[in-house]
Structure formats: C-alpha cells, structure tokens
C-alpha cells in the first residue's frame, strides 16, 4: 500500500490505535487491503453499536451487500450452514446462508430492519430460531487466528472489534463510487475524511498484532 497516500492518518501503529479509538467512540473505520489483493476499502462498524444512520450510510455508499462478520463459535450457536460446501471464490470468503431477524422487521431491507437483524444475531442468548433464512444480511465466518491466518476484511473486522473491547462481531460493506465502480485507495481516503472515519490497512493490523504478540511472549 502506498504509504504516502496514508501519511495523513499517521504511522501504521497510530492508524491501528486511531481505528480502535474511533470504534470505541461509535465511529466507523475504513479498512483497506493490499493493492494486489482485492484492492478495496470496506466500511466497518461494531455490530453492538452500529446505528440506523450508519447503516443507511453504508447502504447508500456501499455495494449493497451488508455483511455481518462472526466467529465460528457464533456460526455454530446460530446453526448457520455455510453458503456452499465447496468454496471456489477467489479469496475463499466465508459466506454462510443469509439471515433476517424472525421478529421486529418488515421486508428486512431497510436500514432499521438490517440493524434489527444484526442485533438479533449477536445477542448473548441468540438461538437459531431468532433468525429466518434467507434474508438481507450476509454473515461472514472469520478464520480462527484473524489476520495472522487470513489477510481478509472479515478477519480484520473481528480483530479490530476484539482489540477495541467489543464482542467479536462487526458489520462491513465495500465502498463503491457513485458510478458503481469499486472505490480504490484515493476514493476511500477521501470518503473516510469526509465522514470522520479512521482509516487502517490490513497490513497495519498484521504488523500491530505481531508486535504485540511478540511482547506478550
């Protein structure tokens, strides 16, 4: 990732710390992956605190595929089958079947309905019967080990939520341009500045975790 583009957001470690602070303050974070991977920026929010307004922003400026990143333990708790048995997608993204809250929603499409679905899925005592399948929220199962195992937005979201002190569950959606094309780093940086979002790269998060885990050992 071009560090000159990112310099206004601080050093790699500062970017991670700023992202964690933003999440704790209820703000969103823009997460960029490598230019030779997906080369995309995802808007992420804590599943526990994301507001209807933030969901509306995400739907309006994103791909429309609003994803809920969860752990394997949560997937099992909710009895969510993986979307396919043989995942042949380019990066092995861990989609499960889609979901809708069983109660408290209308069509499930609105920002408010999607927030209701997210909250139902991450509730402490959530049961499989609390969710209907299919629906308009796309759960993503993160790999154990986070970004140190797989350098994806799904794992980055879970790692950031955990480091910020939230449940390991977060909402993500890819940022798109007004013409429907995918936003690349310059557009993601502009959007993050405009909407008071912190910005961090998956590479930053890998380095941050490696450094902290070396200290711990």
UniProtKB/Swiss-Prot annotation:
Mg(2+) 2 binds at residues 38, 153. Its EC number is 4.1.99.12. Binds 2 divalent metal cations per subunit. Magnesium or manganese. It holds the Pfam family DHBP_synthase. One of its GO terms (molecular function) is manganese ion binding. D-ribulose 5-phosphate binds at residues 37-38, 42, 150-154, 174. GO terms for biological process: riboflavin biosynthetic process. Homodimer. This is 3,4-dihydroxy-2-butanone 4-phosphate synthase. It comes from Escherichia fergusonii (strain ATCC 35469 / DSM 13698 / CCUG 18766 / IAM 14443 / JCM 21226 / LMG 7866 / NBRC 102419 / NCTC 12128 / CDC 0568-73). The gene is ribB.
